A protein has these predicted regions:
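Hydrophobic helical h-region of N-terminal Sec-dependent signal peptides
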Residues: 11-21
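Sec/Tat signal peptide C-region and signal peptidase I cleavage site
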Residues: 21-27
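Periplasmic-binding protein-like
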Residues: 45, 139-148, 153-155, 210-211, ...
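A ligand-binding cleft/hinge motif common to bilobed small-molecule-binding domains
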Residues: 88-92, 106-131, 189-194, 215-251
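A conserved helix-loop-strand patch within extracytoplasmic ligand-binding domains
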Residues: 78, 86, 123-187
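Bacterial N-terminal signal peptides that target proteins for export
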Residues: 2-13
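Hydrophobic residues within well-ordered alpha-helices
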Residues: 72, 94-97, 173, 213-218, ...
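Extracytoplasmic small-molecule ligand-binding "clamshell" domains
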Residues: 28-122, 204-206
């Protein structure tokens, strides 16, 4: 998929996503939202779905999912409120229960305040997330790829026609190689058994956004990085000739809006 196609697809998905928001997935919550007078949108800055910049008293908020949720709030006759989140706390802000992915399973932790009504920022549907969240109909395709600098000796694989076989090939290539990853997100190395490949998995110090992964390898923090489809296409346009896609690390994935499990 080219960058132009990606952008056209984003626009086309807006209409579909709008219908997702009005689905029966959270019918009972709608009355509560109307009574409260505000729709609370939990979002993590990511690709063209949510862009959030806070500089003192000035906030800049844009993105596909932002416009969709704002439009839905308007249709309900309520105000729109953005609730900033990180990958590690977005589930808790929605469900009121801290949940982390650990040892290949969802681990439920302490109770936390509920701060929002839905999560919309191109959330990847993962098995562990489906255990604690309900998802709308998917509205955008995704997947995780291995991306490296062009000066890396890693070479893009030749597609075999089978995603599973391509994933195996890529995993064989990264034995002993540096791979940047990001826990609690769709780039969590534990989701793809990356430690079993013999790769030198590098995790960032402190918080990092998905769109900071490529700049990190450009600064030689690692030779390569895991990167989802949406951010990869944006990065290829932003750094033409400086990065290359080696191949897939995951099966095909899908994105959707997330709701609380107790929403019918």
């Amino acid at each position: 998929m080219s960058v132009k196609t990606f952008k056209r697809t984003l626009a086309a998905m807006a209409l579909m996503a709008a219908s997702v928001m009005s689905s029966s997935a959270w019918a009972d919550d709608l009355q509560q939202i109307r009574d409260r007078g505000v729709l609370r949108h939990i979002g993590v800055p990511y690709a063209n779905f949510v862009s959030y910049i806070e500089q003192g008293e000035v906030e800049t908020l844009t993105g596909l999912d932002v416009e969709i949720v704002k439009g839905f709030a308007k249709s309900l006759g309520v105000k729109y409120q953005y609730v900033p989140a990180q990958w590690s706390d977005m589930v808790g802000k929605l469900t009121g229960q801290d949940v982390q992915y650990h040892n290949k399973q969802a681990v439920v932790g302490e109770s936390v305040p509920i701060e929002g009504d839905l999560i919309a920022n191109g959330v990847t549907i993962l098995d562990w997330r489906s255990e604690v969240l309900d998802f709308s109909q998917d509205y955008f395709p995704s997947g995780v790829w291995l991306v490296s600098r062009t000066d890396s000796t890693l070479s893009p694989i030749k597609p075999s026609g089978s995603v599973d076989e391509d994933v195996k090939t890529v995993k064989q290539l990264i034995h002993g190689r540096e791979v940047l990853a990001l826990e609690h997100s769709c780039l969590d190395p534990n989701l793809y058994d990356l430690y079993d490949t013999g790769a030198k998995v590098i995790l960032p110090d402190g918080a990092r956004l998905l769109n900071e992964m490529v700049p990190a390898i450009m600064k030689n923090d690692a030779e390569s990085t895991l990167l989802d489809v949406a951010d990869t296409l944006i990065a290829l346009e932003k750094w033409p000739g400086e990065i290359k896609v080696i191949g897939p690390v995951s099966e095909n994935q899908k994105m959707a809006v997330a709701f609380r499990k107790n929403s019918p």
